[in-house]
């Protein structure tokens, strides 16, 4: 796992703590429906699971329910207006990316978040990624390997030369299927699963620890 040439990152729960603004949108819908707000601690594990996971948490519904589509659009409208109010990079991410840039290591972002949210958020956070792949950039989303392979191709690095850092089982599944070194961001959201059972080659408790996998 030594000597990898490029780094790819998930966004929500890996580079950025987006749960506060996602939670704001969810709680706005709950208050409108006469429900109590949920705590950030209860929202955080679902923050990597997109609208489906958040609406499932907040309202107990899924895409098969009649009310889902309308709530989804309302959620996205609220979130779009509050995209980076309280979202921040995790401690250590700025330092990691600065060191990666200093070493001349190419890096990018591969997220399932739609590009209409991803690009403004990346810009607001001041992230200068060499490639950004969103949930609608390719035919498939993670856990399919296509988005990661697309990003590696854009960087001009073979998949075997890339490390991918993510905080969800789908990140591990996608990166392993792509032939990349898969590392879990143990400081991230992690969902409801046991990260130790995902099959990744390693895990880190602080972003700067990723440097040991890179040239």
Predicted features by range, described:
Residues 17, 109-111, 184:
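Hydrophobic residues in well-ordered beta-strands that form the structural core
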Residues 2-95, 103, 114-116:
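N-terminal helical cap/lid subdomain that shapes the substrate entry/recognition surface
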Residues 8-10, 110, 165-166:
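Generic enzyme active-site microenvironment
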């Amino acid at each position: 796992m030594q000597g990898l040439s490029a780094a790819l990152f998930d966004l929500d729960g890996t580079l950025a703590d987006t749960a506060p603004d996602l939670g704001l949108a969810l709680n706005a819908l709950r208050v409108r429906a006469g429900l109590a707000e949920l705590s950030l601690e209860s929202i955080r594990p679902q923050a990597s699971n997109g609208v489906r996971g958040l609406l499932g948490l907040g309202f107990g519904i899924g895409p098969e329910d009649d009310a889902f589509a309308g709530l989804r659009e309302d959620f996205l409208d609220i979130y779009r207006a509050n995209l980076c109010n309280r979202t921040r990079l995790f401690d250590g991410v700025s330092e990691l990316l600065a060191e990666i840039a200093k070493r001349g290591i190419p890096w990018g972002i591969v997220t399932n978040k739609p590009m209409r949210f991803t690009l403004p958020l990346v810009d607001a956070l001041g992230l200068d990624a060499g490639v950004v792949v969103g949930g609608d950039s390719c035919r498939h989303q993670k856990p399919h390997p296509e988005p990661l392979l697309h990003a590696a191709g854009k960087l001009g690095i073979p998949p075997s030369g890339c490390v991918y850092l993510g905080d969800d089982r789908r990140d591990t599944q996608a990166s392993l299927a792509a032939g990349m070194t898969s590392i879990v961001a143990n400081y991230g959201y992690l969902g409801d699963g046991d990260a130790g059972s995902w099959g990744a080659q390693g895990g880190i408790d602080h972003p700067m620890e990723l440097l040991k996998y890179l040239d």
